[in-house]
């Protein structure tokens, strides 16, 4: 968003809720708590009336789910960029977007509310814009990047910024390494 690439990052993850002693490889329909577990595919679909993202048990011994994670990246200019994700949050408490804070104002956007908010520090007015985004999207562009990669392999032109996709992937890998090692690590391109 700022045109700068992350050069290093540190990260932490937490796993306090999605833990348990259920058998490895357990699927929701095979669990005795299928109709009562708040995270089961049955409850999510039929009681909460939400889209089911899968039916693997969130509380199995082999689950890779984390409750949340945070990363702080540094850029060459010294700017700090923070990213947080939380998978325990439900319904309207969820957020996905970014907030940019500067010396003259700030701007933020949220994919879930489809809003962009702009605050100019010299004006008492806050401006909010609504936008539309295709329903059911992950917002990360993973599918589009994969299709563009295949298009380039076939000799075609990319429709998205593949370099930005590689920066994103390198940043994610650095964040994972930083969380595992408990230290700042370089973002390698």
Where are these regions (language model features)?
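Contiguous beta-strand/loop segments that form the cofactor/metal-binding neighborhood of enzyme cores
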Residues: 1-113, 145-152
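C-terminal helical cap and adjacent loop that interface with cofactors, partners, or active-site loops
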Residues: 65-79, 87-189
